[in-house]
UniProtKB/Swiss-Prot annotation:
Complexes and interactors: Homodimer.
Gene that encodes the chain: coaX
Note on how the cofactor is bound: A monovalent cation. Ammonium or potassium.
Protein name per Swiss-Prot or TrEMBL: Type III pantothenate kinase
One Gene Ontology cellular component annotation held by this UniProt entry: cytoplasm
Residues given in the record as K(+) binding sites: D130
Catalytic activity: (R)-pantothenate + ATP = (R)-4'-phosphopantothenate + ADP + H(+)
Family to which this protein belongs: Belongs to the type III pantothenate kinase family.
Subcellular locations according to the entry: Cytoplasm
Ligand binding (ATP): D6, V7, G8, N9, T10, N11, T12, V13, T133
GO biological process, one term: coenzyme A biosynthetic process
């Protein structure tokens, strides 16, 4: 089995692939102070509850946007799985994906892996929207190259900033309001956050398509992407497995 680990700014995803399909996925809050022992204790406990034998793991691939967390995940793989993990972004690691931007070294590992995961699953030119701490729009050409993109604040980050900067505005749940014009503070905030974000997504997608000049397929992924299902006019597919699929592809290309 292969263990893939996606360390994001907010959440960390652990997923197991048995050579044919994904068999388990677990999610925890990202905490760079957690040791390898902490991760192992949590992971083994969940695996035992579901009857999963982690001693069968023969490889590990890690994508991390949190540099301070990498040491502990490397130790997790070495000490508890007895494997040497592959880390996205390490010298010599092959992704097979050209990065056609001015400073390739500045592109986050998660964005490259998501672009790869989308390319192997969907034909043609793509826009990959990843909604997490930040919302990224990544452009993938039909020949499998990362062509650049857009980075904007994530929906939760925007909502938290609104609450933190304005003392009288409450924390709210993100949900679609019944109408655009809010009739109280909460519905007005929900309209601004939810509908405002849908307009951000749809507006930027339309501008990207106009600039690109060729048909593009739009795929949404990330922790809050499902919130937009049925509300966006431009998203074609919702796919939560893009990044772990990309990690699996990296593993295959570096065996």
């Amino acid at each position: 089995m292969l263990l893939v680990i996606d360390v994001g700014n907010t959440n960390t995803v652990f997923a197991l692939h048995d050579g044919e399909q994904w068999v388990n996925q677990w999610r925890s809050a990202t905490d760079s102070t957690k040791t390898a022992d902490d991760h192992a204790s949590w992971l083994w406990r969940l695996a035992d509850m579901q009857g999963v034998d982690l001693s069968r793991v023969q490889g590990c691939v890690v994508s991390s946007v949190v540099p301070h967390a990498q040491f502990n995940f490397r130790n997790l793989a070495r000490r508890y799985l007895n494997v040497e993990p592959l880390f996205i972004g390490e010298p010599g690691l092959k992704t097979g994906m050209a990065v056609r931007v001015r400073h390739p070294e500045q592109v986050g590992a998660d964005r490259i892996v998501s672009a790869l995961g989308a390319h192997v699953a969907y034909p043609g030119d793509l826009i990959v929207i990843d909604s997490g701490t930040a919302t990224t729009f990544d452009i993938v050409s039909a020949d499998g190259a990362f062509e650049g993109g857009i980075i904007s604040p994530g929906i939760y980050l925007s909502m938290r900033a609104l609450h933190d900067a304005a003392a009288q505005l409450p924390r709210i749940a993100i949900q679609k309001p019944p109408q655009v014009i809010g009739k109280d503070t909460v519905s007005a905030m929900q309209s601004g956050v939810f509908i405002g974000y849908i307009e951000l997504i749809d507006g930027l997608v339309r501008r990207i398509k106009a600039e690109w000049g060729r048909p593009m397929t739009v795929i949404a992924t990330g922790g809050v992407a499902s919130l937009f299902e049925g509300a966006s006019e431009t998203i074609d597919y919702y796919d939560q497995d893009i990044l772990i699929r990309g990690l699996l592809e990296v593993w295959k290309r570096n065996r």
